[in-house]
């Protein structure tokens, strides 16, 4: 039974079925709506803003050439032929449209570049022992170079403007030349309307100054290689000063030939440690525990070693080795200290190289930003000129209406 405190409240319907209203879609439509909403708001989907008027003007009075096109679904050895597309738009035959000199110049230059690339591939594939044909790749390359010079000698860039000639082999150089021309335009425009007598040249606030600092990476690599060679030479001199003369009859120097200074010191230190009395007692105790023939054989060798002459020879060898070791021990700390210094120097050089790479990357980014800034400034000047013209026209119309 309902709570009596809600019995006489206004706006409550009595004796009617309960109705629960909601703004949500049915369950079958909710999944589809959520999928569409996720697709519209997803960052993985690229939303293109297309201007239909601009697209219509671009493809206006254009038609698709279907000569030689075959899309039939037949089973045969010959492959079907589709539409051909290239990097540049080329006018088809029989369309009634005629190529402009600028389009023809760009098409010829692009075809010459493609032909040069094909000839270079042929030159790399042809072997020296191949028989010379009527038109060799070398002769074809020379003809292509002459054709390129002839194309450049037409001086179409002066007639068609700076946007006609584009160097496909060096696009960055072409953009740099175009930027230089754009920077020269404001100074020419300011100098043209000057009719008053020339004044003393003063500081120009609108001047743009570009400073480029470039260091050849080959020079850094050459200096680094020279330093490494000098360090290796000094290290070789140190090793030649402290190393001992090779003696094939000396058993203590076995295994120490042809090794570095550090490895030689480690080998000699290990052999000197074997001569310690405590180590010899441990070795003797282990040998005594060896059973059978091994113990007898070691006993025979021990008796030979205990001979006075043999002992004197061993003492003499050890004494001579210790004499040489004194000279090595005196210079060894300096060598170790220099090796540690070389290691620190190599670490500093590696960090310096990383800083140079980061600086080079930052310089490239600054160049790109400066290039974009120049383009934005040019666009803003053009837009400002258009706005001023529009205001002038509006003021003229207002004056005429008055």
From Swiss-Prot:
Membrane topology, record value: Peripheral membrane protein
InterPro entries cross-referenced by the UniProt entry: Dynamitin
UniProt KW keywords: Coiled coil, Cytoplasm, Cytoskeleton, Dynein, Membrane, Microtubule
Compartments where located: Cytoplasm, Cytoskeleton, Microtubule organizing center, Centrosome; Membrane; Cytoplasm, Cytoskeleton
Annotated coiled-coil segments of the chain: 101-132, 357-402
Major location category of this protein: cytoplasm
Region called Disordered, residue ranges: 1-26
GO biological process: one example: mitotic spindle organization
GO cellular component terms given for this protein: centrosome; cytoplasm; dynactin complex; dynein complex; membrane; microtubule; vesicle
Function, as annotated: Part of the dynactin complex that activates the molecular motor dynein for ultra-processive transport along microtubules. In the dynactin soulder domain, binds the ACTR1A filament and acts as a molecular ruler to determine the length. Modulates cytoplasmic dynein binding to an organelle, and plays a role in prometaphase chromosome alignment and spindle organization during mitosis. Involved in anchoring microtubules to centrosomes.
Family stated for the protein in its record: Belongs to the dynactin subunit 2 family.
Quaternary data: Subunit of dynactin, a multiprotein complex part of a tripartite complex with dynein and a adapter, such as BICDL1, BICD2 or HOOK3. The dynactin complex is built around ACTR1A/ACTB filament and consists of an actin-related filament composed of a shoulder domain, a pointed end and a barbed end. Its length is defined by its flexible shoulder domain. The soulder is composed of 2 DCTN1 subunits, 4 DCTN2 and 2 DCTN3.
Listed name of the protein: Dynactin subunit 2
Organism of derivation: Gallus gallus (Chicken)
Lineage of origin: Eukaryota, Metazoa, Chordata, Craniata, Vertebrata
Gene: DCTN2
